[in-house]
Curated annotation (Swiss-Prot):
Protein name, entry field: Zinc finger protein 703-A
One GO-annotated biological process of the protein: negative regulation of homotypic cell-cell adhesion
Annotated source species: Xenopus laevis (African clawed frog)
Subcellular location: Nucleus; Cytoplasm
Name of encoding gene: znf703-a
GO cellular component terms attached to this protein's record: cytoplasm; nuclear matrix; nucleus
Region spans: Disordered: 1-35, 90-251, 300-320
Length: 534
């Protein structure tokens, strides 16, 4: 075959290129020749066809994982943020390792066995500190929670097992936390028995380790509950119904029905006006406890909680919880979580101990009808519950024979005052002893009339003594002082009735119309409290 000229067909070129030797010696085509360029493949296509795919998939993803349960977090050496996030998510819903290796000083071999047993359960090792524990405070998180639980049990009079004896993990029922720490202090309590138990202890173990605050509260509350019968022996067992519904038990995802905060037992109904005044209905339509009974919530709660030696008017939580738990409670008397439940219908009780701490009202739902509405329409001299005002702010919770219906709502740094007075004049005289504003005379000097000055001194809690009065308490401005304290402030929920004080005549304000700033937010408070968000 003759050598094809440069413009020949590509078939001849393909035939000559496919044969091993050319038919006739012909000059080699240049690389830029169009025939050679037409037969070329793109370099990208060649690379895609001939490239090895090993760099796309790592070998650990191609090979199956070993049969031993290896946590996938260990592949990243627990250093990447994604591994920390996955480790935190993997611990949700799983109990912590058995607490025996954390409570007592055990040998290293027992620590290793405890670590291996926790790994078999699919959990993280003991020394792992990367998981998020909301109630822990640093490095000694779990040891501190376990030892504090044991320490509070020591103070409460429990028989805690000695250091050489490993305590048995808590049983799921909250009552066994009261009486069973020392039941299994024998030679049978070893690692094998420990490995059999965690499946039955998932609920209580998780909350007792992840929530040390609730654990302390529940142990101290149950210790006060069991203080009637002296020390709890290892053989004494209490069945779960004996705890009642007032027991402070931690919330567990495996056990619904336990409440965190102390609740009255189911046999006690709330006073009718507590539901009525908060839900916006008159108390006559809410069938609660009788108005004439003197043994109301303040008298029945301490007995059912098992607190001996407490007067009926004392708080049901007094002495039942550590100070840290008591500080967490709401100190606002308008809140339903307020713990001084003493004078709710117990004013005519002859056995009450009327000390200053017991004089604090439990639920003083004294909501006036409006800031500029006279309280005399609802606080009549006969103290009969009147519904002529706003239906939200009823006084139906008052008893007919209550001699001291007026309550001081002043709140300072030491807590609410909550003193009771028979008349509104005594209440106003008492309010003038609380605080004095420096420069109060300058503030009142700009008001046009003396009647407005007296009314403003009444509503601003300004004593007539001035800044040099001996009753001046600097820095104790109340959280509950009315919103007229800052007349120039913007109040988004206000009606704008006191925004122009200079031209507003207020001669019709009586001396008894002391009101609370909660009247402005009464609608929001009642809706929130009716839903349980207090």
């Amino acid at each position: 075959m003759n050598c094809s000229p440069p413009g020949s067909s590509t078939d001849t070129e393909r035939q000559s290129s496919s044969s091993g030797t050319p038919a006739t010696p012909c000059p080699t085509l240049a690389p830029t020749h169009p025939v050679r360029q037409a037969n070329r493949l793109p370099i990208r296509l060649i690379n895609m066809l001939t490239a090895h795919t090993g760099h796309l998939l790592h070998p650990e993803y191609l090979q199956p994982l070993s049969s031993t349960p290896i946590s996938p977090i260990e592949l990243d050496a627990k250093k990447s943020p994604l591994a920390l996030l996955a480790q935190t998510c993997s611990q949700i819903g799983k109990p912590d390792p058995p607490p025996s290796s954390k409570l007592n000083s055990v040998t290293s071999s027992e620590k290793e066995s405890g670590r291996s047993s926790s790994l078999k359960l699919g959990e993280s090792p003991l020394e792992d500190k990367s998981s998020f524990k909301p109630y822990s405070k640093g490095g000694e998180t779990r040891k501190e929670s376990g030892s504090s639980a044991g320490g509070s049990a020591d103070k409460a009079g429990f028989r805690v097992p000695s250091g050489s004896c490993q305590p048995f993990p808590h049983a799921p029922s909250p009552s066994s936390r009261v009486s069973s720490p020392g039941q299994h202090c024998d030679s049978k309590n070893n690692e094998s028995q420990e490995k059999k138990e965690p499946e039955a202890n998932k609920g209580s173990l998780e909350t007792s380790q992840a929530n040390p605050t609730l654990t302390r509260a529940s142990i101290s509350n149950s210790s006060a509950e069991s203080s009637q019968s002296g020390d709890v022996t290892p053989s004494s067992k209490s069945d779960p119904p004996s705890l009642g519904s007032g027991h402070v038990a931690p919330v567990s995802p495996y056990k619904p029905g336990h409440s965190v905060f102390p609740l009255p037992p189911s046999g006690i109904g709330y006073h009718g006006s507590i539901v009525g005044a908060y839900a916006g209905y008159p108390s006559q339509y809410v069938h609660g406890l009788d108005h004439t009974k003197t043994s109301l919530v303040g008298n029945q709660l301490p007995g059912t909680l098992g607190l001996p030696g407490k007067p009926p008017s004392s708080s049901p939580l007094t002495g039942a919880s550590p100070p840290s738990f008591m500080q967490g409670l709401c100190r606002d008397p308008y809140c339903l979580s307020y713990h001084n439940a003493s004078h709710l219908g117990s004013s005519s009780c002859s056995t009450c101990v009327h000390d200053p701490s017991a004089l604090k009202s439990g639920y003083p739902l004294v909501y006036p009808s409006h800031p500029l509405h006279s309280v005399h329409t609802t606080m009549s001299s006969s103290v009969t519950p009147s519904l002529s005002g706003h239906p939200l702010y009823t006084y139906g919770f008052m008893l007919q024979n209550d001699p001291v219906p007026h309550i001081c709502n002043w709140v300072s740094a030491s807590g609410p005052c909550d003193k009771r007075f028979a008349t509104s004049e005594e209440l106003l005289a008492h309010l003038r002893t609380h605080t004095a504003l420096p420069g109060a005379d300058k503030l009142l000097a700009g008001y046009p009339t003396s009647s407005f000055g007296s009314a403003a001194s009444c509503h601003l809690h300004l004593p007539p003594g001035g800044p040099g009065s001996p009753t001046t308490l600097p820095g104790s401005l109340s959280l509950r002082s009315p919103h007229t304290l800052g007349l120039s402030r913007y109040h988004p929920y206000g009606k704008g009735h006191l925004t122009t004080p200079s031209g507003l005549p207020v001669p019709s304000l009586p001396a008894g119309s002391y009101y609370s700033p909660y009247a402005l937010y009464g609608q929001r408070l009642t809706s929130a409290s009716a839903l349980g968000y207090q």
